[in-house]
A protein has these predicted regions:
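Glycine/tyrosine- and acidic-biased, solvent-exposed loop/turn segments at the edges of beta-strands
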Residues: 15-142
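Basic side chains
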Residues: 2-3, 41
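Sec-dependent N-terminal signal peptides
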Residues: 3-13
């Protein structure tokens, strides 16, 4: 019976994480970072605005020290400012943007959509007026 109990908890111990928080001089939270047992970022990392209300400035996901998955940044009033996805490079050395990234005006309307290919290069760029109409591209592209 003791062996069964130990085996049930072993997977949880292998995935143990440590959460580190840093604070502004004012005492408000600055960041919350999850680390795996090897000391590498693993999980959601959040940075906060400095007025003490736990208002998130940015949040990104990490796996084994590398940014991967969803990234979001927010305005001071909590609206999404930018959002997109990161992926590992083939060599696994660094992370790069992939898919569609969106940026928003402070008022919440869509500002730009940038599409990145599998190599992290921007292949499509659309810019919007606040009323949603597409802005014409400047001569020569972006």
């Amino acid at each position: 019976m003791k062996k069964i109990i130990i085996l049930l908890f072993f997977p949880l111990l292998c995935q143990a994480q440590e959460v580190k928080r840093a604070y502004y001089n004012s005492g408000a939270i600055l960041s919350e970072v999850h680390y795996n047992i090897e000391g590498k970022r693993d999980g959601t990392t959040k940075y906060f605005y400095d007025w003490g209300a736990w208002a998130i400035k940015t949040e990104a996901n990490y796996k084994n020290g590398k940014m991967i998955g969803t990234f979001k940044s927010y305005t001071k009033d909590g609206r999404i400012k930018e959002e997109g996805f990161y992926k590992y490079t083939e060599a696994g050395v660094y992370s790069e943007r992939t898919g569609i990234w969106k940026r928003y005006y402070d008022s919440g309307e869509l500002n730009t959509e940038i599409t990145y290919d599998e190599n992290g290069r921007s292949v499509k760029y659309i810019s919007y007026e606040k009323d949603g109409t597409i802005m014409p591209m400047p001569e020569g592209g972006c």
